[in-house]
């Protein structure tokens, strides 16, 4: 009986090695953007194609628009839409400093009438702004540019594609552990540890990169990059307490504001140059 158990363990380890090898073979190391003035240089590991993620994002975006339109919650305020689209246009024009190919994306910008304080930019340039963000924060144009620049940066860096790839990688240790031990409890524990060790740190890196690129996009587009600091102060006041940095996919409010102050100083000359044009 003991011999049979060892046999299964050996087979599980062999299968686990094959799974890991297969996953790694499907990944590639890429640099999705130029470094810019802020110096974003991290290599990224991708296991799925841009085309797959872009197609899925476009489909999801279409469904969101259809649902919002059905509920009469899409682009309700014409003046608000014009304001948002105007800022988006200026920001998108600056994406060439990080990704020349982004000018060929099918950019779209829409406003969802909702109390949510939220915004996003899906892969391929599908932007969504919630009216609650504008109304509850009494947001200025500079602050709105900070939000949108941050979200556009996620798309430029293809963070969704990277996260999907990392989630694929994160499943492997738990699966191997379940095969080797036959224990679902241990498999769940393995996935939890993998999440904290692999997925969360990468997510914080993604947020930092989005802050870096976002403030530069805003500055180059003629928006005061220092508005990112006041924006996150407002967000922190509105949101109340936040989870500790170790267990969050976002940097803590205090450390984020410090980083934004440093980044704003780096790109402030770009803002001053843009105002002279």
Give the location of each predicted region:
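A Zn2+-metalloprotease active-site environment signal
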Residues: 2-17, 24-277
């Amino acid at each position: 009986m003991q011999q049979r158990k060892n046999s299964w363990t050996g087979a599980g380890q062999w299968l686990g090695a094959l799974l890991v090898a297969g996953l790694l073979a499907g990944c590639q190391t890429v640099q999705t953007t130029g470094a810019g003035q802020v110096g974003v240089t991290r290599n990224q590991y991708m296991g799925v194609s841009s085309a797959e993620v872009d197609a899925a994002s476009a489909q999801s975006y279409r469904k969101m628009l259809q649902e919002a339109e059905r509920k009469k919650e899409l682009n309700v305020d014409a003046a608000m839409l014009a304001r948002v689209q105007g800022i988006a246009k200026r920001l998108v024009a600056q994406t060439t400093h990080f990704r020349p190919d982004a000018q060929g994306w099918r950019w779209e910008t829409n406003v969802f009438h909702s109390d949510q304080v939220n915004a996003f930019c899906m892969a391929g340039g599908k932007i969504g702004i919630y009216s609650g963000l504008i109304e509850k924060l009494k947001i200025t144009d500079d602050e709105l540019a900070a939000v949108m620049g941050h979200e556009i940066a996620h798309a430029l860096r293809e963070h969704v594609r990277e996260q999907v790839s990392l989630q694929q990688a994160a499943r492997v240790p738990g699966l191997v552990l379940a095969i080797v031990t036959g224990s679902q409890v241990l498999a769940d524990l393995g996935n939890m540890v993998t999440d904290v060790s692999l997925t969360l740190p990468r997510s914080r890196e993604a947020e930092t990169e989005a802050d870096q690129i976002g403030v530069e996009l805003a500055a180059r587009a003629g928006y005061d990059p220092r508005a990112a600091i006041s924006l996150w102060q407002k967000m922190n006041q509105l949101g109340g307490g936040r989870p500790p940095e170790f267990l969050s996919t976002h940097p803590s409010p205090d450390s984020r504001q410090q980083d934004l102050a440093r980044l704003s100083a780096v790109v402030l000359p770009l803002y001053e140059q843009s105002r002279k044009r």
